[in-house]
């Protein structure tokens, strides 16, 4: 029987509550489709930082390197500054393992009430492809004259031809498997060096995909179109910052960030990829057992697809859709009163059923 070795980082807050439900559902998928998991837990979190001064050990990257994938819950706590937790754990993993694509699907499910009027399940279905290793999230910069009236803060944006081309190529290849339409997020009217460079490369790459329709919008009007015309989109590609913003807006448009998954991908599979829900650690509800586990479970389905078991991935995604459409189990964020474990169990049972 095929065994997948998975590193598990539950992290902080509700991450510790939703990760077990993801594992429960994936284990059921393995039982049904003839594979199994060897889960290895890493207790790295903001609590670790408070105790040790580090989000993960100095050799943390080396510890993760042998695994087939990384299954992450959520990272963040009010006791630790957000930039410390992000740059101490997630960004090093993404960069050392060349996870240069952050893929976030957006889909309106039956049984989920969208804040937008007159949209039906199936009418909103697109993906955001975010550049995940460079761009605006650079650590080049610094601060001078701190604490004085002359204080200066500088942070440099870094776009490389190689980095932009590879994420654009991924977006176009993905579009070929979907509705053959790629939209680029830009702001080249105001950001006059990096964004025109992005636009030029977008058009260059697009010439190699004559079967794929293309368009581009400035980020400000693009956010408006996400709300007014979400059916316009198939694959939306953006820089690190723009992709981050759009991939949070997308799930909000379809009803709940709690159901949204993401994959940090090394498409060449030279290094492990990492799968995590879009939502944060939600310390305001942590410990109450009411967090929505669907984002974690759907991220698990994305992991299954990446690991080469698409039938199992399809079964998990169907179980999510059927549970949302027909089951009574639903957490408070989507209009119910079920616990995290009850919703996870309902999805796992549907995966088990053939």
Question: Residues of each region from the PLM?
Answer:
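Buried hydrophobic positions in well-ordered alpha/beta secondary-structure cores of metabolic enzymes
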Residues: 12-15, 68, 129, 171, ...
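N-terminal glycine-rich phosphate/adenylate-binding segment common to multiple enzyme folds
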Residues: 50-154, 241
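Short acidic loop-to-helix transition motifs that present clustered carboxylates
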Residues: 111, 217-224
């Amino acid at each position: 029987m095929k065994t997948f070795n998975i590193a598990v980082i539950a992290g902080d807050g509700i991450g510790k509550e939703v990760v077990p439900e993801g594992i429960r559902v994936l284990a059921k998928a393995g039982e049904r489709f003839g594979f199994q998991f060897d889960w290895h837990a890493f207790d790295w979190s903001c609590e670790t930082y408070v105790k040790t001064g580090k989000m993960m050990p100095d050799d943390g990257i080396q510890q993760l390197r042998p695994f087939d994938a990384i299954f992450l819950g959520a990272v963040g706590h009010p006791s630790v500054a957000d930039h410390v937790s992000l740059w101490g754990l997630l960004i090093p993993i993404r960069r050392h393992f060349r996870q240069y694509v952050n893929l976030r699907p957006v889909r309106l499910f039956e049984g989920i009430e969208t804040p937008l009027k007159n949209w039906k399940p199936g009418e909103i279905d697109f993906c955001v492809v975010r550049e995940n290793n460079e761009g605006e999230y650079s650590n080049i910069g610094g601060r001078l004259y701190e604490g004085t009236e002359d204080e200066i803060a500088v942070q440099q944006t870094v776009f490389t031809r190689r980095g932009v081309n590879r994420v654009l190529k991924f977006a176009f290849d993905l579009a070929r498997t979907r509705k053959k339409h790629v939209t680029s997020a830009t702001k080249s009217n105001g950001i006059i060096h990096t964004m025109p460079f992005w636009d030029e490369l977008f058009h260059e790459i697009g010439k190699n995909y004559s079967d794929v329709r293309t368009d581009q919008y400035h980020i400000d009007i693009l956010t408006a179109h996400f709300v007014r015309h979400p059916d316009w989109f198939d694959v939306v590609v953006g820089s690190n910052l723009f992709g981050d913003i759009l991939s949070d807006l997308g799930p909000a448009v379809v009803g709940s960030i709690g159901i949204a998954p993401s994959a940090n991908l090394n498409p060449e599979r030279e290094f492990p990829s990492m799968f995590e829900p879009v939502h944060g650690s939600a310390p305001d509800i942590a410990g109450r057992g009411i967090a929505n586990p669907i984002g974690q479970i759907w991220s698990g389905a994305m992991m299954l697809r990446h690991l080469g078991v698409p039938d199992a991935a399809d079964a998990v995604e169907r179980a999510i859709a059927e549970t949302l459409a027909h089951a009574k189990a639903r957490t408070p964020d989507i209009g119910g009163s079920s616990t995290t474990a009850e919703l996870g169990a309902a999805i796992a049972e549907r995966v088990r059923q053939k």
